[in-house]
Amino acid sequence: MEVNIINVNSDRIGTIDLNPLIFSVNYRPDILKMVVDWQLSKRRAGTHKAKTIGDISGTTAKPHRQKHTGRARQGSLRSPQFRGGAVIFGPVVRSHAYSLNKKVRNLGLKVALSLKNSCNKLLILDSIDVNFVKTTQVLQFIKNFEHKSFLIIDKDYNKSVVCSCRNLHNVTLLKQIGTNVLDILRHDCIILTVGAVKYLEERLL
């Protein structure tokens, strides 16, 4: 699959062959949902906590004697039926992460990249290290397109590139090793450098 390579002026400077096993995979919404749910579950902090009967401070004495009061039998004022009492089966601090097969994760990445490619929302850029030094340069580049948000993926980048992109709310900079389904789907346009394409093909094949 032959795709044009552009420079920062949006001029065509060459072509690159994209592997159809990565950039032309059938659309699988079920796989995308599995991977996105897995990513969101790993992102959760899991710091929710409700106090059990052992966590509540207070007396441990029996409220009243067992019999001959006409009232229901009680063993503790910290029981859940009392005001200020414990919570039964409440949330506890835990990790929400779970494992997902590597083949499924890789397939989700292929499906997401193929989806952007089929919608003509995938751009191949020659390089960003030399060209993206100032924020105005990045802004001038993205103004050439009508997309709402941009995800720029490169194999590696220097500090000046980070500084030039971080003030733009609709531009996200990502290293190739951090390429993920959630970020690809959340951005309107994906910009890959030539180096990132080669690393992705090595990683996913």
UniProtKB/Swiss-Prot annotation:
Biological process (GO), any one: translation
SUPFAM superfamilies: Ribosomal protein L4
Keyword Manganese attributed: no
Pfam families hit by this protein: Ribosomal_L4
Protein's UniProt keywords contain Ribonucleoprotein: yes
A single MF term (Gene Ontology): structural constituent of ribosome
Region annotation Disordered: where it falls in the sequence: 54-78
Keywords: Ribonucleoprotein, Ribosomal protein, RNA-binding, rRNA-binding
One GO cellular component term: ribonucleoprotein complex
InterPro entries reported for this sequence: Ribosomal_uL4, Ribosomal_uL4-like, Ribosomal_uL4_dom_sf
Chain intervals with Basic residues compositional bias: 62-71
Xref: Gene3D superfamilies: 3.40.1370.10
PANTHER family: 50S RIBOSOMAL PROTEIN L4, LARGE RIBOSOMAL SUBUNIT PROTEIN UL4M
Subunit structure: Part of the 50S ribosomal subunit.
Annotated function: One of the primary rRNA binding proteins, this protein initially binds near the 5'-end of the 23S rRNA. It is important during the early stages of 50S assembly. It makes multiple contacts with different domains of the 23S rRNA in the assembled 50S subunit and ribosome. Forms part of the polypeptide exit tunnel.
Protein family according to the UniProt entry: Belongs to the universal ribosomal protein uL4 family.
Alphabetical list of NCBIfam families matching this protein: rplD_bact
Name by which UniProt lists this protein: Large ribosomal subunit protein uL4
Species annotation: Ehrlichia chaffeensis (strain ATCC CRL-10679 / Arkansas)
